[in-house]
Amino acid sequence: RIYVSQNAGTVQASNKTYIMSSYSGSITEMYISEGSYVNEGDLVAHIKSTDIDMQQDNLESQLKIYQTQLDQYNKLLQCVQDDTNYFSETNPEDQPYYYQYETYKSQVSQKTFDATAYQAAGYSDAQIKTMMEQSQSEVEALYYSTMQSISQSITSAQSNVDNVQAQLDALNTGANDYYIYAPT
């Protein structure tokens, strides 16, 4: 014989948990339906965070600017070392560096000693030699101060690149937070 009993009641899970994301955004994919049974660690949903995406885009733009700046300063350093202007006067990105190098070269030419005028004026060879040595010393001081200034700019630009890259890496490391998993 079979006995059938009908009773009214509600079945509840022994563990009920509410899940929230640490980022705001819109749910792009749901891997389960509401009320489904899940196991610990199951993937529940994917969230697209517009705030983080905008922050990442902004950081990538900054990184590009700082990297270009770093490249330009390295090129300027090479210009001074090679005594050649590798920048284009017509390229808007090159112009500040082109003119920076040209200013340096103008200062060098102002400090360069021309003995012919002094010889014609009757200066002695000893006086001319002293003036030439002083002029050479000033040109060397200008060279080293320019190299030091450019090197400091390179260090600063590299620091900016490293800082923004670290922020991007930290942002990308948190990419797992875009996914919601069942609590463990």
PLM feature spans:
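N-terminal beta-strand block that forms a small beta-sandwich/beta-barrel module immediately after a flexible targeting
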Residues: 1-24, 28-31, 180
